[in-house]
Swiss-Prot record:
Keywords: Cytoplasm, Heme biosynthesis, Iron, Lyase, Metal-binding, Porphyrin biosynthesis. It is found in: Cytoplasm. HAMAP family: Ferrochelatase. Pathway: Porphyrin-containing compound metabolism; protoheme biosynthesis; protoheme from protoporphyrin-IX: step 1/1. SUPFAM superfamilies: Chelatase. This is Ferrochelatase. The lineage of its organism: Bacteria, Pseudomonadati, Planctomycetota, Planctomycetia, Pirellulales. It is an enzyme of class 4 (lyase). Pfam families: Ferrochelatase. It catalyses: heme b + 2 H(+) = protoporphyrin IX + Fe(2+). PANTHER family: FERROCHELATASE, FERROCHELATASE, MITOCHONDRIAL. Catalyzes the ferrous insertion into protoporphyrin IX. It comes from Rhodopirellula baltica (strain DSM 10527 / NCIMB 13988 / SH1). Its EC number is 4.98.1.1.
Length: 351
């Protein structure tokens, strides 16, 4: 077996997003292709994007993250050029890998902009990259991801700092306000085959301990499947209403811990809908920033890269779960969605 070439590049792996009104529907068609999502739901989400001029902030935030990473790579002696590829919009994975091949790159380390393990946040990206390599053909660079950093000290410190800063804006402290951690809901069929919930709860606990939050909960947002399909709950809006009904909420901090950047789902679901609900109920609400370009988060990514380059002797991790694996097991995060019954027949497994 031939020896693997050394790592010669870094790939930022992301979801992608529209950058204008004309991009919105083609982008959403990419996102929802092959999924059992009602068209009315797609049109509803399209209105969310149009509310913000058809521009998702995710692309600009990825550009800012790349710029911040480049500075830290230079400072830490990491001599890897940075590339960027998306699942659902420009720059697409195949286009990026094609450019990397043209640049003579053979083997890349990748950071997935998802801190928690599940099919859509990890395995699907790996499948996307395999498909892109097949499309590029002979000479396409190898791509290997760094480990999940959900319990890395850098991520926990960044999240705790953002919660504390948000609490200050409403004259509170994490110890004296309700804190809700939100993550993207996923189908129960997906959640049952991965460590998404376990990692989220551990990360939330670690952040709460780090910032002194006493009264906190994990809730979910942004579900997109049909009503008949069970997804992770409770929904953030339902949770706020139920908590306020049970015991009047004076103040609330919401941290989108499951999202790396303040992209469209964060802006609409939290800054629009959750904020409106809190105004109607007289709750002082502050939304903490996602990880973004927080210095501790950026330094964490550098550290994960240095681990794989053999420049660190340890793998920092807080809590009980320890450092996550570098290489995903073969059956990691498997998910085969079921199609709805057709003409009264039994559900058919998707290929």
């Amino acid at each position: 077996m031939s020896e693997l070439p050394p790592y010669d590049s870094f790939l930022l792996v992301s979801f992608g997003g529209p950058e204008g009104q004309d991009d919105v529907m083609p982008f959403l068609e990419n996102v929802l292709r092959g999924k059992n999502v009602p068209r009315e739901r797609m049109l509803e989400v399209a209105e969310h994007y149009k509310h913000f001029g058809g521009v998702s902030p995710i692309n600009e935030q990825n550009r800012q993250l790349i710029a911040a990473l480049q500075k830290r790579f230079d400072a830490n002696g990491i001599d890897l050029p940075i590339y960027w590829g998306n699942r659902n919009w420009d720059p697409y994975f195949a286009d990026t890998l094609r450019q990397m091949k043209a640049d003579g790159k053979k083997r890349s380390l990748a950071f997935f902009t998802s801190m928690f393990s599940c099919y859509s946040g990890c395995r699907q990206y790996r499948e996307n990259i395999i498909q892109a390599r097949e499309e590029v053909g002979e000479g396409a660079p190898l791509v290997e991801k760094v480990r999940m950093g959900f319990n890395h000290p850098g991520f926990i410190a960044a999240m705790a700092d953002n919660v504390s800063k948000a609490a200050q804006t409403i004259g509170a402290s994490p110890a004296r306000t309700k804190v809700l951690f939100t993550a993207h809901s996923i189908p129960m069929g997906m959640a049952d085959n991965c460590d998404y919930e376990k990692q989220l709860r551990e990360s939330c606990r670690l952040v709460a301990d780090a910032c002194g939050a006493v009264d906190w909960d994990l809730v979910y947002q942004s579900r997109s499947g049909p009503p008949s399909q069970p997804w992770l709950e409770p929904d953030v809006l339902d949770a706020i209403a139920e908590m306020d009904d049970a015991k009047k909420l004076e103040s609330l901090v919401i941290l989108p811990i499951g999202f790396v950047s303040d992209h469209m789902e964060v802006l609409f679901d939290l800054d629009e809908e959750a904020a409106q609900l809190c105004r109607e109920r007289g709750i002082k609400m502050a939304r903490a920033s996602a990880a973004g370009t927080h210095p501790d988060f950026v330094e964490m990514i550098c550290g994960l890269v240095q681990e794989r380059l053999g420049k660190l002797n340890e793998k920092p991790a807080l809590g009980e779960l320890g450092p996550w694996h570098d290489v995903c097991p073969q059956d990691c995060c498997l998910y085969t969605p079921r199609r709805p019954p057709v003409a009264g027949g039994r559900p058919v497994q998707a290929n």
